[in-house]
Every structure is written in structure tokens, then in C-alpha cells.
């Protein structure tokens, strides 16, 4: 609804302002350059550019991003008064999103390190380190993440939950319209079930507005641009790899053990 859309936009923008203000005014402690220099000297055998995302992984990301923008625009532009035949574009983008997610599940399961993106108790030391750095404390020798920082993994978890709900409800809602793919049958569920389906779909859509705002914000932050560039060009520098990652948790080509993905 209009109220929920504005609430999501307001919450997202307030988060951006609060976080940006915090990063400017706080004593947020950065990684030690001296420590990184020592690591780089000890890992000269690694290539200068290290692959972070394969072409197929990047293609999935941008296809998903494009379909997500189409879904959000076709969902909320009519609410603000922009009239067009949005239903067809909406369910078509939904099918593209669904297809990209299915591809990603297969690709991540059989061709990548499946467990590297998940969050668990093992990540508590890393979380504590990030909190200490946020309060300006130097944490020499602190644990570093593997391929994906904790923030990325938490965001992935949120997108997964929201995405599965929005896809499940969206496919069900296709039975309410004429798509030419499934036969229209609004009687497959009772009215209360349809109501819950629409509410769930709408809430997840509004939630995605906030998630997309946060994603774009962090992608454009100066200290995160190295991650954003990797999603465009596929590689990161050896220095960024050693500064932000633990080679024992994400081994790359040229190290003693390699990790697929």
C-alpha cells in the first residue's frame, strides 16, 4: 500500500543518514596498513588480481538485479499514479527472477563453495571483531572472513527469506490473472488464503524496497567500492584480498589449497 511504501522508503533513508553520520563522526577503526604490508610481503606468490566472481556469478547478479528493479517499478509506480499495463511486465519479471534463483541454487550447490555464504555460530568471533572496530578499538590479529564478509552473508540470508516468500506467493497469484502459462483459476484457494497470500507478497515487496536501498548505499560507499568493482570486473587486488579476507578460509589459485567459486 501507499502507507507501507512510504514507511519503507522513510526507514531506508533514515538508516542511510544514520549510518553515514556514524561513519563520519565515529572512531571507526580501519584495518592496519602495516599488517597488510606484512601480509602482502609474505604472499608475493599470489597473483596481483584475484578472481572473486566468475562471469556466470556476475551474470546471475545483474539479471536478478534487473528483474528486481522491474518488479519494484511495476509494483509501486501504479500506486503513485503512473498508469500502464503493469501486470504483464510484473509477472514476466517475476518469472525471470524465479529462473535466475533456480540457476543460482544449482550453480552455488555444484560449482561453488556452498557453505561459504551461510551464517552460523562460527561467525561470532568475527561479529565481535566488527563491533570492537566500530567502537574504535584496534584488534590486531583479529579473525577475518572467508570469501564473503559477515554483512554480505546476513544480507544474503535476508534476501533468501524475502525472495522465497515473494516467489512462492507470486507464482500462486499467477492463477488470478491470464498469463497463458497457467490456467486462470481463482478458486484454487479460499478467500482467507488468498488474503494471506496477497498480504505476504505485499509485505515482502515493501521489505525489498528497504533491502535494495541498503544494498545500493553500501555498494557506493568508498570503503566498499572494491567489492562493487569485483561484481563488475570479477577481480579484486591481492592487497584487498589480504586486507579483508583470511587466506586459510578462502584459498585462491596460487595458494596451497584452492576453493571453487
Predicted regions and their residues:
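Membrane-embedded alpha-helical bundles that constitute the cytochrome b-like, heme-associated redox core
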Residues: 1-261
Amino acid at each position: 500500500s501507499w502507507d507501507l511504501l512510504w514507511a519503507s522508503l522513510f526507514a531506508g533513508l533514515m538508516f542511510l543518514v544514520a549510518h553515514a553520520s556514524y561513519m563520519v563522526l565515529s572512531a571507526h577503526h580501519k584495518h592496519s596498513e602495516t599488517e597488510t604490508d606484512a601480509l602482502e610481503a609474505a604472499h608475493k606468490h599470489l597473483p596481483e588480481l584475484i578472481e572473486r566472481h566468475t562471469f556466470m556469478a556476475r551474470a546471475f547478479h545483474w539479471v536478478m538485479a534487473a528483474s528486481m528493479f522491474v518488479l519494484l517499478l511495476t509494483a509501486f509506480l501504479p500506486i503513485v499514479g503512473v498508469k500502464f499495463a503493469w501486470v504483464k511486465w510484473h509477472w514476466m519479471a517475476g518469472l525471470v527472477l524465479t529462473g535466475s534463483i533456480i540457476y543460482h541454487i544449482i550453480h552455488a550447490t555444484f560449482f561453488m563453495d556452498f557453505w561459504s555464504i551461510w551464517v552460523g555460530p562460527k561467525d561470532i568471533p568475527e561479529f565481535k571483531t566488527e563491533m570492537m572496530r566500530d567502537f574504535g578499538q584496534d584488534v590486531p590479529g583479529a579473525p577475518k572472513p572467508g570469501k564473503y564478509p559477515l554483512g554480505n552473508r546476513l544480507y544474503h540470508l535476508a534476501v533468501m527469506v524475502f525472495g522465497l516468500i515473494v516467489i512462492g506467493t507470486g507464482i500462486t497469484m499467477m492463477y488470478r490473472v491470464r498469463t497463458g502459462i497457467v490456467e486462470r483459476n481463482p478458486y484454487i484457494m479460499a478467500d482467507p488464503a488468498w488474503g494471506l497470500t496477497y498480504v505476504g507478497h505485499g509485505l515482502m515487496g515493501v521489505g525489498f524496497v528497504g533491502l535494495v536501498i541498503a544494498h545500493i548505499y553500501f555498494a557506493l560507499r568508498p570503503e566498499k567500492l572494491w567489492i562493487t568493482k569485483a561484481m563488475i570486473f570479477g577481480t579484486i587486488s591481492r592487497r584487498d584480498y589480504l586486507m579483508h579476507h583470511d587466506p586459510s578460509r578462502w584459498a585462491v589459485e596460487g595458494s596451497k589449497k584452492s576453493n571453487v567459486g
